[in-house]
Structure formats: C-alpha cells, structure tokens
Amino acid sequence: MLYGFSGVILQGAIVTLELALSSVVLAVLIGLVGAGAKLSQNRVTGLIFEGYTTLIRGVPDLVLMLLIFYGLQIALNVVTDSLGIDQIDIDPMVAGIITLGFIYGAYFTETFRGAFMAVPKGHIEAATAFGFTHGQTFRRIMFPAMMRYALPGIGNNWQVILKATALVSLLGLEDVVKATQLAGKSTWEPFYFAVVCGLIYLVFTTVSNGVLLLLERRYSVGVKRADL
C-alpha cells in the first residue's frame, strides 16, 4: 500500500511529533516569560516583548524561519572563525525547534497574558490574606485558574505549530513531509503520497483535539456552565 516506504514514513512521522512537542515546550516557556514581562511594572522588559510580539506577528512564518536559521548559522560561523575552529553546521532538528519555539512563543505570550488578566483579582487577594507566598499563589491559584482561560488559545497554537512543522522540511529535516516527498518521487506517485502526508497530519490533529478536550474538562472542574 505504501510501496515499501512505510518504515521511512513512520520514522518521518515520529520526527514530526518530536519536533512539534519540543517546539511547543520552548514556545510555552517563552510565552510565560513574555506574559510576565508584559504584565510587570518593568517598562524596559515590557517594551522588549511588545516589540518581539509585534515583529513576529507582522512577518510571515516562512520568512522568519529562514532568517532565524541562516542568521544562526552565520553567527555560529563568525564565532568558529574567530576561534579558529572548524565550521559547525546546525542540526535541522535543533534549528527547527529554535525557530518554531521563537516564532510561536510570541503567540503564547499573548495567550498567557490574556489568561492571566482574566483571573479574578479576588482570588489573588484571598491567597494573600491566607498568607500564601508569591510562589504558592502562582502555583496553587493563578496557574490553575489561568489555564482554564488559556487552554483554547493553547490548543489553537498547538495545532498551528503542528502544521507549521511541514515548513521545517525546507531546512533539510527528514520529517514526514520529506519522507512522503521521497516516496512520491521514487514511485512516480507524488499525489498519492501527498494525500498520505495529509492524512497523517489529520490523525495528529484529531488525536490532539481529544487530548485538549480532556484537559479543558480537567481545568473546568467546579465551574458551572451556562445552560442554553
């Protein structure tokens, strides 16, 4: 059915999942830091992240990906030349994680910023009244409450990152897109394997929707839903 390319395509699918999961972890970390910076009283860090999110949202993802990838490679070459050592090529997987994480960290910044702002101030005041430290207030009050508001945005960002992994094949990563392209060229069946690639991504997104639904139910425990 896959003309002997099932192993290659399976390996490519695993690489795609690894890339997506690693990228979303980096993006979430950047998003939490960025949201904290934009909500803090420090104007300098707030302006830095404001410029960062504005830049990312104003430039196409593919252009940013190429700029970051080649920019990192050029910077690394300058460092290796100055140290008199051999040139080091950036691994496509590492490059993909950094570029996707950096790009979508801006979107997570806005997602988390809005979610933190939606947490009722009364919750924080109550935690302070009970003698909670800042760390305890964040872990036990703010983060669980924020997640209920952030999950829809997190789900959307995850789906976009998952589909954006297809762009990383342009950097030389042997993901599911590259694997199906190879199979299509080798068998003279490019359309067939393009459909296979699309179906694999559809499976990924369908499973993701199920996981996100479970998470939304988990963080909505105790919250009354309006009856329509």
From Swiss-Prot:
GO terms for cellular component: ATP-binding cassette (ABC) transporter complex; plasma membrane. The chain crosses the membrane at residues 13-33, 59-79, 88-108, 153-173, 195-215. InterPro entries: AA_ABC_transptr_permease_3TM (IPR010065), ABC_transp_permease_HisMQ (IPR051613), MetI-like (IPR000515), MetI-like_sf (IPR035906). Keywords: Amino-acid transport, Cell inner membrane, Cell membrane, Membrane, Transmembrane, Transmembrane helix, Transport. The keyword Transmembrane helix applies. Residues 13-212 form the ABC transmembrane type-1 domain. Its main location: membrane. One of its GO terms (molecular function) is transmembrane transporter activity. It comes from the Bacteria. PANTHER family: CATIONIC AMINO ACID TRANSPORTER, MEMBRANE COMPONENT, HISTIDINE TRANSPORT SYSTEM PERMEASE PROTEIN HISQ. This is Histidine/lysine/arginine/ornithine transport system permease protein HisQ. It comes from Salmonella typhimurium (strain LT2 / SGSC1412 / ATCC 700720).
